[in-house]
Amino acid sequence: MVPLCEGDLWQELSLLAAGCRFPHLDEMVNIASINGRKVLGLELI
């Protein structure tokens, strides 16, 4: 999302929440964990 980003997941999620006005913390956790596992090809717990 950010051209010169350091790859920090917290920074990316903060930008997503602020830029899209997305206040749902539980869904942010799912984006970071469940979707992250899917992208990496890891089994879901």
From Swiss-Prot:
This is Uncharacterized protein HI_0843. It comes from Haemophilus influenzae (strain ATCC 51907 / DSM 11121 / KW20 / Rd).
